[in-house]
Amino acid sequence: MTEHVYHALLQMLVQGVLKRGSVLRIDLLAKTLDVSPTPVREALARLATTGLVQHEARRGYTIAPPLDRKQLAELMDARRLIEVAAIGRACENGCAAFLADLEKALDTQRKAVEAYQSQKDEGGEDLAWQVMVADLRFHHTIFENTGNRFIRVMSQALSAQLHRIRQSAQAGISDDRNALEEHEEILAALRTGDRAVAERAMEKHINNVERRSELDLTD
């Protein structure tokens, strides 16, 4: 139950359903999600570790302010350090099953982007969320194939922080097609079996994400 509530609140935070700076009342959230207060309290405590919400002794849980440019730079630097190394290791461990899993993740992302593009002018908040989930799934597939459990744990913490980029953006998703094209380049690089080629493709992707994210940040 806590896992379900966590993801429901995460989606509400990233989509802007819960407004920045507002106090998150456990009783009201429990009523909205039709659950008891306990899983809401547990989910908020977990969300506090991501930086999406913060806890103050007398106010309770509130939505955190958006990332500033220094925080974004630090986060993207962490991505470069972890993800470039991870794809290098995954490339060394590469096998047909891994590439098939990555192709499947990419196909899911492709369909999500197409669905979002066809309906984004009519709202499409849930479709935008599916694009974000599919994007992360692609990266998780790489982490899962490093053969290193600690890298996988680090990836989970990193993914939670990446949601703050979306939360901090001025509006929705603006780079879904760019990210898809870059993921296609990453898969093509992995198919070469050349670690250096794969690492360069990932570094290029992260650099581009950082540049686009800087443009999307609120001042």
Predicted segment positions?
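Short linear motifs at protein or domain termini
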Residues: 1-92, 217-219
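Short arginine-rich
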Residues: 207-216
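Juxtamembrane/interface motifs at transmembrane-helix termini
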Residues: 41-42, 93-95, 119-123, 172-176, ...
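Short alpha-helical transmembrane interface motifs in multi-pass membrane proteins
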Residues: 68-69, 166-169
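A generic short alpha-helical patch detector that favors 3-5-residue windows
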Residues: 1, 51, 55, 74-78, ...
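Conserved amphipathic alpha-helical segments that form helical-bundle/coiled-coil interaction surfaces
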Residues: 92, 96-167, 180-189, 197-208
